[in-house]
Amino acid sequence: MKQGLIGVLALALGATLLSSAVWAKTPWQEIAHPVAGTPQSIGSFSNGCIIGAQPLPLQSLDYQVMRVDQRRYFGHPDLLAFIHRLSTEVKRTTSGNVLVGDMGMPVGGRFSSGHASHQSGLDVDIWLQLPRQRWSEQQLLKPQPIDLVNASGLNVNPRVWRPEVTTLIKTAALDSDVTRIFVNPAIKKQLCAEAGHDRDWLRKVRPWFAHRAHMHVRLRCPADSLECQEQSEPPIGDGCGAELTSWFQPKQPSSEAPEKTTPPPLPPSCQALLDRHFAAR
């Protein structure tokens, strides 16, 4: 019981960090509107920005957008098109509504907390639940995640795991614009067990810390975004063997203090974007 409570508290804390507005703002969070221009994703997913970002339409029959008060629903047009494709197909196959979490800020850039990536307009968090009934405005502003992983962290919780979660993740992975989908290792383990002979899509599904209630979907660099830095391809194979097993091995405690890291220099085009914005104020 104690372990279960710890798991619930950990999930709640994670959700609080992701949605907190009390942290000090970064310069990027002070820019309220996209920069006009031909859409261009610049830099890397964890050190970049975007010109010509577009807001995801907040009204759709197939998806709902959460925490709109935080204005994290901007992205490259390719990302908006992916969300439309995903939600349309998932609605057709499951009758459920896709819940869209954080995308990016109006010009991308670094968050003060919650995300290291989501900076170049090509990342989106999709919650791993598909409600048949539309959520109210209050539910969308204060969404309640469902922790799909049990207290041990070794397996999904069978009481809350649903087959349509596999459908949701697989549908996203089969999209040609998607390069990676980050989920909790226990969720990846469950997907490996359910996949059967059709396993190629599992290559894109990558185990990562947390991600107990949502998947983080990342798209490839758009062909015409010449300053976008592509991530290397995932390793060959379904990722269900030794690589996945390593996530469940006991971690050896380190005797060394963690090194303090400083953010890398911005790509020149992103620094210029910031400079122009604040010079005009």
Curated annotation (Swiss-Prot):
Its EC number is 3.4.24.-. Keywords: Disulfide bond, Hydrolase, Metal-binding, Metalloprotease, Periplasm, Protease, Signal, Zinc. Zn(2+) binds at residues 115, 118, 125, 216. SUPFAM superfamilies: Hedgehog/DD-peptidase (SSF55166). Residues 1-24 form the signal peptide. Binds 1 zinc ion per subunit in the active site. InterPro entries: Hedgehog_sig/DD-Pept_Zn-bd_sf (IPR009045), Peptidase_M74 (IPR005073). Residues 230-271 are annotated as: Disordered. HAMAP family: MepA. Belongs to the peptidase M74 family. This is Penicillin-insensitive murein endopeptidase.
